[in-house]
Amino acid sequence: MEKIKVIVVDDSVLMRRLICDMLESNDNIEVIGTAINGQDLLNKLKVMKPDVITLDIEMPVMNGIETLKAVKSLKIDIPIIVFSSISQKGMKYTMECLYLGAFDFIPKPEKPFELSKMKDDLIKRIRVAYSQNTNKNPAPINPVIRRETNRISSDSIEAVVIGASTGGPKALYKVITKFPKDMNVPVFVVQHMPVGFTKAFADRLNDNSAIEVKEATDGETYRKGVVYVAPGGYHMEVDSNSRIKLTKEPPIWGVRPAVDKLFISASKIFKSHIVSAVLTGMGKDGSNGTGIIKDNGGVTISESETTCVIYGMPKAAFETGKVDLVVPIDNVADEIIKIVRGLRR
C-alpha cells in the first residue's frame, strides 16, 4: 500500500513533534513536511504534494481560518483536518473552518502530552480523508430521485428529524439556513460532534438562519418553528409529553448522540407524521431509524452520493430499501419544506 503523505502545521515545536511521532508510528503514513504557520504551508505546497494536511487553528502570521481560505483559493483539493482548542474562541473558529471546507476536526487537549489519547482517532480520520479524496469521481449532480417502490403517503407532518456526521456541519448549514421562520413543525438534529462543540455549532446556525436554532436541553418542551441540536455526549429523544429527553445511555454504532436513537424515538411519537433525512457521514447510524420511520408511514430522505463528503450513512439508509427520496444537498431543504407543507405527493 502506498503511504499517505501528510504535512503537519502547528506553531508549537512540541506539538509538531508529538503529532509527527504519532503519525510516523503508523506504517501507512509518512510525514513529508511540517510548517510553523499558514504562510509557511503555502510556501511548502509549491514543492510538496501531500495527501492530507493537519492544521492548527490558532497560529501567528497566518492562522487556520486564513490558511484554509488561501488553500481553497488556490483550487488545491487536499483534505484538511484541523486541531481545535476547547476554548469558546477555539470552538467558534472550528465551526468557521468546517464551513470553509475543512474535512474534519480533532479537539486539541489542554496538555500536549495528552495528545497520545487521540492517536487512533487522528489516524482513522486521516485514512478516511485520504480514501475519500482518492476515490472521488467527478460526476454530474443528479436531480431528486424518487424511488418508485415507495409511495410518499404521509398526510400531515408534525416533525422533522435529521442526522449527519463527517461533512455534516456544512451540509446542515445548507439545509437549515433555508428553513423559513414559519416552519410549522419542530426540527430535531443529531450531528456527531464532541462535547462542547454543539453549542457553538447551534449558535452559528442560529446567527445565519431565519428559523430559531438552539442546543437542546433536558426536559424542555419542544416548540414548532425551532431547530433542536443534540448536545455532544448525549442521546436525544422525544417523549409523549412534548418534551426532549437527553440521556447518557451507551453509545450506538460507537457514537453518542446517535441518529438512530433520535429517529426511533421520534417515530414512536409522531408515527406517520414525520420526515427524516440522513446526510453525509461515515458508518451506518440512521439506517435502522430510517427503516422504522418508513415502516410507520413516515417520509424518508437520504443525501445523494454525488454531494456527500462521505457516502456512508446515506448509503446504509438507502440500502434498507426504505428511502423515498434521494436528494443532492442543495435540494434537501426544498424537499423537506414541500413535504411539510403538503406540496410533495
UniProtKB/Swiss-Prot annotation:
Domain CheB-type methylesterase stretches = 153-343
> Superkingdom of this entry's organism?
Bacteria
Record-linked PROSITE patterns: CHEB, RESPONSE_REGULATORY
What are the 4-aspartylphosphate sites (modified residues) in this protein?
D56
Alphabetical list of SMART domains matching this protein = REC (SM00448)
Its UniProt entry gives the catalysed reaction(s) as: [protein]-L-glutamate 5-O-methyl ester + H2O = L-glutamyl-[protein] + methanol + H(+); L-glutaminyl-[protein] + H2O = L-glutamyl-[protein] + NH4(+)
Assign the protein's first listed, main location to one coarse class. Answer: cytoplasm
Q: Which GO terms describe its cellular component?
A: cytoplasm
* UniProt PTM: Phosphorylated by CheA. Phosphorylation of the N-terminal regulatory domain activates the methylesterase activity.
PANTHER family associated with the record: PROTEIN-GLUTAMATE METHYLESTERASE/PROTEIN-GLUTAMINE GLUTAMINASE, PROTEIN-GLUTAMATE METHYLESTERASE_PROTEIN-GLUTAMINE GLUTAMINASE
Under which name does UniProt file this protein? Protein-glutamate methylesterase/protein-glutamine glutaminase
